[in-house]
Amino acid sequence: ILNNSEKTTANNKKLQINLALNYGSRNEIVNAINLIKKKKVSLTLRNIEKNLYTSNIPDPDLLIRTGNTHRLSNFLLWQAAYSEIFFVKKLWPDFTVSDYYKILNNFRNLKRNFGAL
């Protein structure tokens, strides 16, 4: 299924969806730091970012967390620093296209400040 989905959407340009299977952000960060140590380069924000699993994709602008849980659960802890996060009470199987469009509409109307006050 995943290989077929990847082939089918390979030329799509407008929306990027990333699936994280058996993924843990804390392990990813430790792995990045160990790679930096092995390369004997400075431990900088940029070098950490370059050694994350997600180094070849942009940080998410928007995260949607379903299931009435207000936490990231070890998901993209580094990359989500300036993401807008929407928490939805519904469980994933009950999340609808209408729910998605409501969130997108709210997201479009946000003034993003990327950490600035």
Name each model-derived stretch:
Residues I1-L117:
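Flexible, compositionally biased loop and terminal segments
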